Design a protein with these regions (language model features):
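Structural signature of multi-pass, alpha-helical inner-membrane proteins
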Residues: 7-179
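Bacterial N-terminal signal peptides
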Residues: 1-4
Length: 179
């Protein structure tokens, strides 16, 4: 299923960058400098402020539409982050890992087994505009670097054409106003 929605790039602007991080469950006793609270169901859980991963470690994504109309995505990480994810999920089973996207909690997963493939999933809660930003910032899973660069060049051409069209429309409005 393909949904045609104008991207920010097609509207004449480069999309802003998303900030995505995953945070491991901590303890309230760690203190407010080290953890932050999040309500989960009828409980309040605490998560470490220090993230497990960083944006620059994501190498690709594969997104999907969820039943609630938001998006989910699988994020693939570089080797260094994949090793860290494997170690953390091995030693922290029976804890939660929360995804924070642009300053808001999006989804949380329960760690029931080690993650050995360097991939973390957000099952729901990503907005369409955020998916567009990710698509602009990184390759889709299975897409070569060359294919990704060509896709971005297409976005740039659309952006420049939209800017030119907007400028021409403004010039026409100014011309009519002055006559």
């Amino acid at each position: 299923c393909v949904i045609a929605v104008p991207s920010a790039a097609a509207m004449g602007k480069r999309p802003e960058k998303n900030i995505l991080s995953f945070h491991l469950q901590g303890h309230q006793s760690d203190g407010p400098k080290m953890v932050f609270p999040l309500p989960m169901g009828n409980k309040k859980r605490f998560f470490r402020k220090s993230p497990v991963t960083f944006n620059k470690e994501i190498v690709s994504l594969k997104h999907f539409i969820t039943e609630d109309g938001t998006y989910g995505a699988t994020f693939s990480f570089n080797k260094a982050a994949a090793g860290r994810i494997a170690a953390i999920t091995t030693s922290n089973q029976d804890k939660w890992l929360v995804a924070m996207l642009n300053g808001r909690p999006v989804d949380a997963v329960y760690i029931d087994k080690p993650v050995g493939d360097g991939r973390l999933v957000i099952w729901r809660g990503i907005k369409q505009v955020e998916i567009s930003r990710f698509e602009y910032a990184m390759p889709l899973t299975g897409e070569t670097s060359k294919q990704w660069k060509e896709r971005i060049k297409g976005h740039e051409r659309q952006r420049k054409a939209a800017q030119k069209e907007a400028q021409e429309a403004q010039n026409e409005r100014n011309r009519r106003r002055n006559n």
